[in-house]
Amino acid sequence: MSMKLHVKTWGCQMNEYDSSKMADLLNSTNGYISVEHAEDADVVLLNTCSIREKAQEKVFHQLGRWKKLKVNKPNLVIGVGGCVASQEGKAIRSRAPFVDIVFGPQTLHRLPEMIKEVQENKGTVVDVSFPEIEKFDSLPEPKADGATAFVSIMEGCSKYCSFCVVPYTRGEEVSRPLDDVLLEVAQLAEQGVREVTLLGQNVNSYLGATYDGDTCSFAELLRFVASIDGIDRLRYVTSNPIDFSDEIIAVYEDTPELVNFLHLPVQAGSDRILAAMKRGHTVAQYKDQIARLLQVRPELTVSSDFIIGFPNETDHDFEQTMDLIKYINFDTSYSFIYSQRPGTPAADMPDDVTLETKKQRLAILQDRIQQQSQGIGRKMVGSVQRILVEGPSRKNIMELCGRTENNRIVNFEGDHRSIGGFVDVEITEVHTNSIRGKFIRGEAEMNLRESIRPSDIVNKHENKSAVNSYIPA
């Protein structure tokens, strides 16, 4: 009888990607079947995030619920992974001794061996090391789940912003080899994936090794991925303005597969606060980057991250942030109240902005972003948008839903055979959280590239070590 696995995920798209790899790995090596409820599982894994406040306490609350399951099922294996595990491994072992496995983001590929050790009664297993890119060499072929997919291109970050724990929990920047990334994308395209999102803590700094000993920049990678037939839409997260080069901007000019949507975190609109955050750029530099992008992509919409109430943030600093929001006309944002992260330089700064002030500023900022988002949405009425159809609408299963290039959800009446493909839809109504449209045409009437097998995009060459490498044709 097959063993059952339950994975609970908190945090960013990278964590979602890692969790999917855990499930694929354990299925391919040991036949584990994923289940929705922890009560039904033989192994439960918690993939954690340490970015937000009280992340550690949130973990222990969840583990407390799982402890009760273990009372009734003594052989249940409980594992904690992700950034909290990497940062607080000792605390987890101390406060939750019933946890069997503690593993970091870079050691998830060792899960089959860790679980085996626990099941053989060899005690608790802890591995939160940083074995660079080793985990990608040990993972199975990707499995597509719909028309969209995430592909990790690098791990870690070397920027050391004063508020951020990522360099301490995921390590410094390590890029996957170019061939590995292209092969994974081609394998996903073979399975019907049409849209790929490239993932990394700072994708702009990607420098992947090539088969001939050279390196590939992020701009070059974007063009390579866009050239794979079947991949008609390309996204990426997350970016850092200091690595957003002219070469990347040039890709927006000549690569239509790259969507008209960019998430480029700025965090604050005050140069003084940006310096305290150690962001490495100014407001003027950020504005200049967006202006040059809009010159080559006038229809581009932009989203960002904002930290509210960073130490010593004054009313004037916040007003400057609001000025930047208006100037750029951000479509959406991920905005949060500042909270100290243990081990970061900012944790040594006095947290001198009151919670009430932080909440007031956050409400003002989010209200402004919402107004701008609604304004951008209203301008879409009457336009024809290309939609990647994701499936039936949640509100009406007789209708379809999909996303525009600028990440808006659109509901419309159409043929369910369109699921997984593209349609053109005229936008008729705009609501706060969704858009309604009218079907105009399907893929048969579009001028998309002729579909060929994505595996033909790469040529397989065997080197002297009998190791396959994959080189763009």
UniProtKB/Swiss-Prot annotation:
Subcellular localization(s) per the UniProt record: Cytoplasm
Phylogenetic classification of the source organism: Bacteria, Pseudomonadati, Pseudomonadota, Gammaproteobacteria, Alteromonadales
Record family assignment: Belongs to the methylthiotransferase family. MiaB subfamily.
One GO cellular component term noted in the UniProt record for this chain: cytosol
Domain annotation MTTase N-terminal: ranges: 3-120
GO molecular function: 4 iron, 4 sulfur cluster binding; metal ion binding; N6-isopentenyladenosine methylthiotransferase activity
Record's keyword annotation contains S-adenosyl-L-methionine: yes
Enzyme Commission code: 2.8.4.3
Description of how the protein assembles with itself and partners: Monomer.
Comment on bound cofactor: Binds 2 [4Fe-4S] clusters. One cluster is coordinated with 3 cysteines and an exchangeable S-adenosyl-L-methionine.
Name of protein: tRNA-2-methylthio-N(6)-dimethylallyladenosine synthase
Keywords: 4Fe-4S, Cytoplasm, Iron, Iron-sulfur, Metal-binding, S-adenosyl-L-methionine, Transferase, tRNA processing
Enzymatic reactions: N(6)-dimethylallyladenosine(37) in tRNA + (sulfur carrier)-SH + AH2 + 2 S-adenosyl-L-methionine = 2-methylsulfanyl-N(6)-dimethylallyladenosine(37) in tRNA + (sulfur carrier)-H + 5'-deoxyadenosine + L-methionine + A + S-adenosyl-L-homocysteine + 2 H(+)
Alphabetized Gene3D superfamilies for the sequence: Methylthiotransferase, N-terminal domain (3.40.50.12160), tm_1862 like domain (3.80.30.20)
